[in-house]
UniProtKB/Swiss-Prot annotation:
Matches recorded under HAMAP family: Transcrip_reg_TACO1
Protein name in the entry: Probable transcriptional regulatory protein Bmul_0984/BMULJ_02280
UniProt cross-references to InterPro entries, sorted A to Z: Integrase-like_N (IPR017856), TACO1_YebC-like_2nd/3rd_dom (IPR048300), TACO1_YebC_N (IPR049083), Transcrip_reg_TACO1-like (IPR002876), Transcrip_reg_TACO1-like_dom3 (IPR026564), YebC-like (IPR029072)
Pfam families per the UniProt record, alphabetical: TACO1_YebC_N, Transcrip_reg
GO cellular component: cytosol
GO terms, molecular function: DNA binding
Family in the record: Belongs to the TACO1 family.
Gene3D superfamilies given in the database record: 1.10.10.200, 3.30.70.980
Length: 242
């Protein structure tokens, strides 16, 4: 992938996540509650809950916290009032942005999301205005130096759709989002532990930002990420560090 390093971006993302661990735990607890409410408390039969619990483990969340969140979701308390709402919009230069939220007050949430967009040079769009520019997929990223041939064989056998090597040597594996847990288990059983493993909205095309534009775009993305009701922010913008 020309012009920027996938691997550097992932390391930056992980470092930023570590710095916001408390916020990540709060988001994961909400996601676990909602997943348990909608699909039951058994991770073996609830893929969404399984994904959330795996993320909680990766974030070093205590198992007691996870169990309490599942119990609250199944019992209908607290998490029962959360509503899933997706907002779509544009950053500077027309960059596409998707904002997924879990909220108990949609009036508050839409006001906060709209304010973040307008404050940092973006604007909210209508439903479907940018979502078509993304694919809902399972994504795995493996460190440079991973055996490409062995990983490709294991990934394709596990049911992955695509395996590609980036210019920085990292290897990306993509699969249908509904097959994510199955592919993840198979890859780990074959000895491959991904540095990044997630269900995501992957942009079909990316737009690079440098200099002042990169700073402005990062401020918008940070403002959206920092909103309490926001669970995930997806964009086709790539911030190039110079």
């Amino acid at each position: 992938m020309a012009g920027h390093s996938k691997w550097a971006n992932i390391k930056h993302k992980k470092a930023a996540a570590d710095a916001k661990r408390g916020k990540i735990w709060t988001r994961l607890i909400k996601e676990i509650q909602v997943a348990a409410r909608l699909g039951g408390g058994d991770v073996s039969s609830n893929p969404r809950l399984r994904l959330a619990v795996d993320k909680a483990a990766d974030a070093n969340m205590p198992k007691d916290n996870v169990k309490r969140a599942i119990d609250r979701g199944v019992g209908g308390a607290d998490g029962a009032n959360y509503e899933e709402i997706r907002y779509e919009g544009y950053g500077i230069g027309g960059a596409a942005i998707i904002v997924d939220t879990l909220t108990d007050n949609r009036t508050r949430t839409v006001a906060e999301v709209r304010h973040a967009f307008s404050k940092f040079g973006g604007n909210m769009g209508t439903d479907g205005s940018v979502a078509f520019m993304f694919d809902h997929v399972g994504q795995f990223l493996f460190a440079p130096g991973t055996s490409e041939d062995a990983l490709m064989e294991a990934a394709l056998e596990a049911g992955a759709d695509d395996v590609s090597t980036n210019e920085d040597g990292s290897i990306e594996v993509l699969c249908d989002w509904q097959e994510f847990s199955k592919v993840k288990d198979a890859l780990e059983a074959a000895g491959f532990k991904a540095e990044l493993a997630e269900v995501t909205m992957k942009p079909q095309n990316e737009v690079e930002f440098t200099g002042d534009d990169a700073v402005k775009m990062q401020k918008l993305l940070d403002a959206l990420e920092n909103l309490d009701d926001v669970q995930e922010v997806y964009t086709n913008a790539v911030i190039v560090e110079e």
